[in-house]
Design a protein with these regions (language model features):
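Interfacial/gating helices of multi-pass transporter permease domains
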Residues: 5-26, 54, 94-98, 155
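Helix-loop interface residues and adjacent transmembrane-helix termini in multi-pass membrane transporters
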Residues: 9-12, 122-124, 150-152
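Interfacial segments at transmembrane-helix termini and the short loops linking adjacent helices
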Residues: 12-13, 60, 77-108, 152, ...
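Interfacial transmembrane-helix starts/ends
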Residues: 19, 51-80, 97-100
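Membrane-interface helix-loop junctions in multi-pass transport and translocation proteins
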Residues: 127, 134-181
Length: 181
């Protein structure tokens, strides 16, 4: 949805720059998601035997490890984005480095709320979670459209919309996790 809105307001060059950022995010987050996914069987086991304290400890420790692992992977890319993109693409699109940095920073925020999601999934009570989070993420393209009408800078509002959604997700996931148990 955001790509369509970006293309509407700023054209294909900005859309390509965001696409490069999303590609870098996919490469880095794939590794982190595998790390987090490896904890899922243990979370389900703790939930099944009603050991909620051990489950919460695993969520907290796993979140810390995942965050610092992503930080270890993302920090060099954030610092040397221009160099990495030049190695990869020779001539990266304008704003690609900015989008890469911002998307990787947003990924760090998102990592903090991923394992609580697996805790909710372990409970099997996902109806409320899916309704709330889907409603939240459906709002991003709508907010982006309104924001780009007011603010004519492609990066500025994209950052605000993405970060607002992740901060809301970060706040809502623990609440939804409490509702699931």
């Amino acid at each position: 949805g955001v790509n369509i809105v970006l293309n509407l307001f700023f054209g294909t060059a900005v859309n390509a720059a965001r696409g490069v950022g999303v590609s870098v995010f996919s490469a880095v987050s794939g590794f982190i998601n595998n790390f987090i996914f490896a904890m899922n069987p243990q979370l389900v086991k703790y939930y099944a035997v009603q050991n909620y304290e051990a489950m919460q400890q695993l969520i907290v420790k796993g979140t810390k490890y995942a965050f610092f692992l992503l930080l270890l992977l993302a920090l060099p890319i954030v610092i040397e984005t221009d160099f990495v993109l030049t190695l990869w693409l020779k001539t990266p699109p304008p704003l690609a480095a900015t989008f890469c940095r911002l998307i990787l920073i947003a990924a760090l925020v998102e990592t903090l709320s991923t394992l609580p999601l697996y805790g909710i999934l372990a409970s099997g009570r996902i109806k409320r979670y899916v309704l709330v989070m889907s409603s939240l993420f459906i709002c991003i393209p709508l907010l982006s459209y309104v924001g780009y009408k007011w603010c004519n800078k492609p990066v500025t509002f994209c950052v605000y919309a993405e970060m607002a959604s992740y901060v809301l997700a970060l706040g809502l996931r623990p609440w939804l996790a409490r509702c699931a148990f």
